[in-house]
């Protein structure tokens, strides 16, 4: 690994299972390679997560807070509250909002796009990191279009990047 060349899956598993002094050596090599590649500069973003609904059809347990639409604890924020939270985040120095939520059973086809347009209207300079791959698939399905077309629409609506979770 210290050569900087790609390693095999089997070699990665060996490194992943390292214990004791070997674990410390893996860390030292990783730190050396990082320093060679990018130096000591560390960057970050000030981010606010806006989970606009916890109502979800999946019941997968990933987020641990989802609710069935019939449950009392289920909520869906109005777009005005979502944009208020984005503005508040920006006021406090956030450069990015992460917009994610459950998959509500009665979701309008254009909901995700509308949320992004409203956020960008109110806070044009904020970076929208929005919608998990599962939400994108769900939005495309609800809109009866391909995921490629749906991603294009989300980009046009203001999504800057997408998370890789869920």
Give the ranges of each region predicted by the language model.
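Conserved Radical SAM active-site core
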Residues: 67-166
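Conserved, mostly hydrophobic/aromatic
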Residues: 4, 30, 60, 99, ...
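A broad, low-specificity signal for short, low-complexity segments enriched in glycine/proline
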Residues: 6-7, 59-61, 123-124
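A broad, structure-centric signal for solvent-exposed, well-ordered loop/edge residues
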Residues: 14, 22, 57-59, 84, ...
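Canonical Radical SAM [4Fe-4S] cluster-binding loop centered on the CxxxCxxC motif
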Residues: 42-81
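Flexible, acidic/Gly-rich N-terminal and inter-domain linker regions that tether
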Residues: 1-49, 53-57
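Generic short alpha-helical segment signal, independent of protein family or function
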Residues: 31-38, 57, 61-68, 87-90
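Bulky hydrophobic/aromatic packing residues
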Residues: 16, 35, 44, 62-65, ...
């Amino acid at each position: 690994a210290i050569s900087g060349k790609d390693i095999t899956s089997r070699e990665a598993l060996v490194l992943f299972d390292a214990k004791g002094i070997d674990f410390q050596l893996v860390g030292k090599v990783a730190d050396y390679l990082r320093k060679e590649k990018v130096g000591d500069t560390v960057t970050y973003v000030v981010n606010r997560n806006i989970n606009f609904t916890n109502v979800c059809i999946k019941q997968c347990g990933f987020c641990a807070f989802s609710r069935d639409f019939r449950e009392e604890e289920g909520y869906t924020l109005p777009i005005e509250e979502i944009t208020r939270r984005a503005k508040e985040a920006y006021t406090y120095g956030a450069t990015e909002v992460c917009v994610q939520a459950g998959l509500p059973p009665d979701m309008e086809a254009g909901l995700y796009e509308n949320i992004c347009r409203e956020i960008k209207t109110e806070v044009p300079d904020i970076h929208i990191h929005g919608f998990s791959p599962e939400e994108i698939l769900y939005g495309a399905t609800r809109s009866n279009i391909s995921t490629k077309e749906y991603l294009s629409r989300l980009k046009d609506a203001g999504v800057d990047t997408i998370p890789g979770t869920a």
